[in-house]
Amino acid sequence: MFIMHHNSVLLHEAINALNINPSGIYIDGTFGLGGHSHYILSKLTSHGRLIAMDRDWSAVNIGEVLTKQDGRFSIIHAPFSKMLRCIYNMNLVGLINGILLDLGVCESQLTDSSRGFSFMRDGPLDMRMDNSVGQSAYEWIAKASQKDIEWVLRTFGEEKLSKKIARSIVLKREVYPIDRTSALSEIISDTVLYYNNRYNRRKHPATRSFLAIRIYINEELVEIMKILQDVFKLLAPGGRLVVISFNSLEDRIVKKFINQYSRVFAYPPKIPLTHTQLLHKYSGTMKFKNLGKIKPTVLEIKKNIRARSAILRYAEKLIYM
């Protein structure tokens, strides 16, 4: 039996939110180390099916082991923004009973210094989820203008000292290549602590900047917006969308999307609309039932500090669409 020792955030809450049909078809759009997938499979009968996706080859390699152990499971190497295309090729569009997206960085990506995600571990400055394509963080920092660096730090990291940090990076890269996580972390930390003596020491000074660069390099927010626009086509009537986000930018996108498609336009009384017109207006704007949000318990946060910023939002596709 496949078992992966991994503390998946909001594990039980996410699977409960999917409202598993034992013979249904489900998608884990962010396989990672397989924590959520393993739990979903435990809820399915032999007639059920789970399709996983991940753009990280190391995750796909783990998933391929599971495919040999469980015929109900398959995994695809692709970002979840390509989900509609992949599911179309499998003739399953409109038949999916639930989609789960865990938007957090996998624990193994943070602890593997060679991936370059963490300012706590020295390694090559890469940060790519799929290191077989695209530019690395080092390559981008080496050629990006000061203005572009500032924009990324401010937009994706909400870093108040973005201008000063960008200036420091541009000055330092003229002296030596910023190709290690430790080098970038030191530049950012020195800048933040120099200009802000009252900085909250409980949070590492490089936290926001590393987050911003990672989001930019992997186009993470674009990925989220793309998949959200496709979920209506993918889900079966009554199918569930469950998204776990880990920062305010991600959560804002998910919250806005669900709210936008779970509202009904309120028409003043006595407006002369026929039943058909009302139904058209209603179904054209309301496609989801907003089922709310869930946050980790204090106990889970104590056991897994990564859970402290997690927010789970979920919704159900309306049957009459």
Curated annotation (Swiss-Prot):
Instruction: Please indicate which superkingdom the organism of origin belongs to.
Output: Bacteria
The residues that hold S-adenosyl-L-methionine are G34, G35, H36, D54, F80, D102, Q109
Q: Alphabetically, which GO biological process terms does the record hold? A: rRNA base methylation
Q: Which reaction does it catalyse?
A: cytidine(1402) in 16S rRNA + S-adenosyl-L-methionine = N(4)-methylcytidine(1402) in 16S rRNA + S-adenosyl-L-homocysteine + H(+)
The enzyme class is transferase
Record's InterPro entries?
RsmH, SAM-dep_MeTrfase_MraW_recog, SAM-dependent_MTases_sf
Location in the cell reads:
Cytoplasm
**UniProt cross-references to Gene3D superfamilies, sorted A to Z:** Putative methyltransferase TM0872, insert domain (1.10.150.170), Vaccinia Virus protein VP39 (3.40.50.150)
Q: State the protein's purpose.
A: Specifically methylates the N4 position of cytidine in position 1402 (C1402) of 16S rRNA.
Q: Which family does it belong to?
A: Belongs to the methyltransferase superfamily. RsmH family.
- Specify the protein name: Ribosomal RNA small subunit methyltransferase H
The species is Blochmanniella floridana
Q: Tell me the name of the encoding gene.
A: rsmH
